[in-house]
Amino acid sequence: MGGVILCKQSISTFQYFKFVIGVIKREKIDIVHFHFGSYLIAPFLRILFPRIRIISTRHSEIFVSNKLKKLYLKFCFFPFERFRCVSCGVKKEMIEGVGFSSKSEVLYLGVRKKKIVNPNLKKTLDIPKGVVVLTTIGFNIRIKGFDILVKSIQSLMDSNRLKNDIIVLVIGISENSEDSNSLRQLIAEAELNRKIMSLGIRNDINDILNISDIYLQPSRTEGLSLSIMEALNYSLPVIGTRVGGIPEIVHEGENGYLFEKENVEELADIEILVNNREVREMMGRKSKVISSRFTLADGVEKLASIYHQTN
């Protein structure tokens, strides 16, 4: 027994429902663990398979805009026995949005530091020696706040507030996508083509973090950023928005700085870290200490414990 069963992404909810039913019957599944996908099938799984356990990991905040949506989510979530929230911020939004406080708990994700494959990546990317490297990772311009980042870098360059030269590496925007075109346009309009590099989707994130000096997470919404956790592992100071679970791993003035989302000028406080190597290194050491609380091994052990508790 064991292995991975893949489902095509481009199928309807009904086809997805049939697929899940088939897997449950064929593999004699005891626990169904939702991460993403159509929660609408959960009530029907409960009816068809009353003995299986249904749990969920909530990776992002819930924003309930109206009563109808709230009722819909309550209906979908009612069959779940457990909600594993990736941060206190996500748990808070979950309870305030749809309730289920007695079923909700925080279980932080974990990361593992990988080996460096290309220690000469700076040379490969043609980044001059002495340039301060800032990195941000995300899949969507608006959600991850890359437009805010571009504006803040533009503000810094226009005001000549930086004592050191910088380069910003943007990772995760698929090349030839609408977002990629929009990002290139934003960068060009701000005349920052020589300061911001969009590297697309990469498999060498660890190599990139290894050559970075500062990590940025200007998200408009965030559950708990695995990218920040990885950055902490590489002793990087972090500047992030005060949303979701970010304040739980970025401690103001200790291993980085927090700013209100949409606030271009607050994010422009990047200059504090760019201009002060000693502050960067001091905060980076604190990041490494904080990262020890979020190991992959601990996350797996706690998840296994939840599986046994629900069985």
Q: Which stretches of residues belong to each language-model region?
A:
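A short, active-site helix/loop in glycosyltransferases that binds the activated sugar's phosphate group
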Residues: 80-106, 111
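A short helix/loop element that forms part of the nucleotide-sugar donor recognition site in Leloir-type
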Residues: 115-127, 183-184
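Conserved donor-binding/catalytic core segment of Leloir-type glycosyltransferases
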Residues: 128-144, 150-153
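Glycosyltransferase donor-sugar binding loop
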Residues: 137, 167-181
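Aromatic "clamp/platform" in nucleotide-sugar-dependent glycosyltransferases that forms part
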Residues: 201, 220
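Short hydrophobic beta-strand element within catalytic cores of glycosyltransferases
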Residues: 237-240, 250
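Conserved acidic donor-binding segment of nucleotide-sugar-dependent glycosyltransferases
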Residues: 252-253, 257-264, 272-278
